[in-house]
Amino acid sequence: MRNYLLLSAMTCLTAMAQEQAPMVLQYDKPATYFEESLPIGNGKLGALIYGSTDDNVIYLNDITLWTGKPVDRNLDADAHKWIPAIRKALFEENYALADSLQLHVQGPNSQHYQPLGTLHIKDLNLGEIKHYQRTLNIDSAIVRDSYQRNGKLITREYFASNPDKLIAIRLRGDINCQIALTAQVPHQVESTLGQLTMTGHATGDPQESTHFCTMLSIKTDGEMAASDSSLTITKAKEAIIYIVNETSFNGFDKHPVKEGANYLEAVANDLWHTQNMTFDEFYARHLADYKAIYDRVKICLNKNNRNPNDLPAAKDRRMTDQLLLDYTNGGDQSQYLEELYFQFGRYLLISSSRTKNVPANLQGLWAPQLWSPWRGNYTVNINLEENYWPAFVANMAEMAEPLDGFIAGLAANGKYTAKNYYNIGEGWCSSHNSDIWAMTNPVGEKRESPEWSNWNMGGAWLVNTLWERYQFTQDKEYLRNVAYPLMNGAAQFCLRWLIENPKQPGELITAPSTSPENEYKTDKGYHGTTCYGGTADLAIIRELFINTIAAGKVLGKKNKEMEKALAKLHPYTIGHMGDLNEWYYDWDDWDFQHRHQSHLIGLYPGNHLTDATLQKAAERSLEIKGDKTTGWSTGWRINLWARLHKPQQAYHIYQKLLTPIAPRGSKGSQWKIWHKGGGTYPNLFDAHPPFQIDGNFGGTAGVCEMLMQSTLKDGQATIELLPAAAEAWKEGFVSGLCARGGYEVNFEWKDGKVRDCSIKAKKAGTVTLLYNGQQKTIKLKAGQKQNIKTW
C-alpha cells in the first residue's frame, strides 16, 4: 500500500477512539515495608498507606516541613581568595594540591526534609482475615483496600485533594477502631470528641524552626470517645476522617518563627471547610481537578499483547508485585506493566509538585523516616532536573511551576554565593545541593570530597528547564518576565567564571572544575576529582549560552558577548577508546561504569550535541558505561539511547529499570528471588537504591522520547514520530504528547509504522513532521487541529 498524506476534516482518529487499559496497582496483602506502601498526595500534603488489617499505619508528609531557617548570605565571604591558588596548582598539574585546597571553598550542607506525622487506625475487631485487596487507581487518584473479618466486609478509601487541601479517608463496614496521631519530630497531641490536634516543629531549636499544626476530624454514624491523644469509634457502619495541615513556612527568605505564616488560623479555616461537603462531593472535586491534567495523555504500547489476567477486571489478576517479578525473572515483558509505570510517573508528579516555590524533592513528597537519604534535599547535579523531564512532553506543564519561584530564590541567594565563593559580582550561581531555603553555596563543610561538594553549575543547568517550558508552551510573556531574566543571570555568572585556557590561548575553560561525583585517573596514576576544562561544565555552559541567545532573539535582545564566548569554548574531544572525553585530557574514569554521565548533557536533556561524530563517541561512552547502574541513572540512559535513535538499547535499559528490587531491610524467603541494585520496588517506586523519585520521572520521560522527539530552531519546529520505539511495541497509540513549538500530538502505529496522526497548534506556525521515512511540512493556525493519514 502506497504511503500518502491526507489532510482532512476528520473529527477523530482510530487511535483516539481506542481506550487505554485501566491503570491500577493491585496487591493481595498489606504493606510491611515503605517500598510496598501506596502514595497519595495533593502536591503539598501526602500520605503513604500501608493498609494493615490490625494497625493501619499511614505516614503523613507536608512538602514545606524542613529543618533550618533562611541562609546566612554573608557566610564565607572570603572563600574566593582560595581560587587563584587552586588555579595555580591546576595549571602546574598539581592535582593533589588542588583537591586539598578545594576544601577551603566549601560551606555548610543542606537542611533536612522531615516527616509530618503518623496516623494509626487500629481495628478493634477480632477474627480471621480473608479476601484482602489493596489498590491504587492511577486513573482516579484513589487508594482502596478491603478485607473480610469473620465474614464481614470492611472497606477503606483514601485520597488527597488539591482544591480542598485535605486528605480524606472513608471506612465502611463493621467499624470499631482507635485513631491516633503521633510524630517523630517534637510534637504534642490534644483530643476532643471527634477531633485530634497535633502541633509541633521540625527538629531543632523551636525558636528557629518551622512549626506545624495537623488537625483531624471524624464524622460517623457510630459512637465516639476521646482519650488523652486518641479517638475511639464503635458501633459504626461508616466513619469519615479528614486531615488538614499547615506550616509556618512563609518563603525561602522569611524566618519561620519571626516572619512565619499564620498556620494556626490557616489550618482552622481548612478544617472548617470540611464541614461544608460530603465525602463524595470532596472526591468529585478532587477527581475533576486531577483528571483535568492526568487525562491529557493516554497510551497503549501493544494492544494485542495484553494478558487478560493483568487487567483489573480479571478474576485471577496477577498482582502488581508479581507482574513486576515475572517481567524480569519470568521473561514476561508485559507491555501493560510498561504502560502502568509510565502513567505512575505522571501520577507521582501531579501528586507531588503543586506547591508554589517548593518543587518535588529527592523523595518527591513521601518520606516516612526522620532522616531521609541524602537529607531528602534538592540535588541539582541531575536529580532535580530529572524530576521535571516529563513535565512538558507528557502534558503537565503546570507541574513545573513550583520551579519558577524556587529558581528565583536560588538566583537571589546565588548572587551572594557568586561573590563570596568566586569573587564574581554579576549574575548568580548554585551548587550541588539545595533545600527549601534556596541554599546555593558549595557544600562539604570544608571536609568532604570535591567530587560532589565543589561544583557551581547547578543554576546554569537548572534554568534550561525554564527555556524548555517556553519551547513547549510558546508563552512569550513567561519567557520575558520569568525565564529570560533567570537564564541571563546564570549566563552572566558563567561568562565571568570562564577563563582563557593557558594551554591553548584563545579558548575558554573553567577552572577549577569537577564532573559531578565522578573521579579520574591521570596518565601518571593520580586518582582525583579537581581539574580544569571539564567537559560537563562546558556542556552546561554551551547549552545555556545557546538557549539564552535564542531566548534573547525571541525578545529582541542582543547577546554579542555571549555569542563570542560560545565560539571560544574548548571543544569536545574523543578519547582513546572512541568515547567522548569527560576530562580535558584523555584520562580514564576511575570507575568506567560510574552512574553519572554528565559529559553527555548536550545530548540529553540538552539538544546541542548533534554532530554525527560526537554522537558516535557519546554512544561509545554509553556502551562502556554498561547497563547496571542506579535507578535514576537508568532513567537518564533510556533518554540518551533514545536521542541516539537506538530503539533496541533504549528498550533494554527501560527493561532494566523494571528490575524487581527487594525493599530495604526486607527479611523472609519470599524476598530471595527479588534483586538488589537499581530498578523498581514492589510499589513501583524507583530504587536507587534507596528510593529516589527521579528514576520514576526519568522512565516516564524516556518512554516519551522513544515515541516522539521534537526540536525548535529559529521558530521552525520538527517532530519525529517513533524515533526509537521498541520492536516489542507492535501496535499501539498515544494521545496528548506535547512537542516543542507548542504542538499537541496524537498518533497510532502498527509494525513500526505510523498509521494515523493529529497535530494541534497552540499558536500559528509551521512544523515539519518526520514519519515512516518521510518528511512533510504543515502550516497550522492557532488552535487548529490537523488530522493526518499516513498509509
Where are the model-predicted features located?
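Catalytic cores of secreted or luminal carbohydrate-active enzymes
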Residues: 106-124, 693-740, 744-745
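Well-ordered alpha-helical segments within folded domains of soluble proteins
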Residues: 382-392, 456-467, 536-546, 598-607, ...
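Hydrophobic alpha-helix feature that most strongly marks membrane-spanning transmembrane helices
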Residues: 43, 471-474, 499-502, 553, ...
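Extended amphipathic alpha-helical segments enriched in small hydrophobics
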Residues: 469, 476-497, 542, 641-657
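Bacterial Sec-dependent N-terminal signal peptides
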Residues: 1-20
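Aromatic-residue-lined binding/catalytic grooves and analogous aromatic/hydrophobic interfacial grooves
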Residues: 18-450, 468-470, 480, 488-491, ...
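Acidic/histidine-rich catalytic neighborhood
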Residues: 368, 493-551
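C-terminal catalytic domain of Rieske-type non-heme iron oxygenases
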Residues: 364, 368-369, 508-512, 518, ...
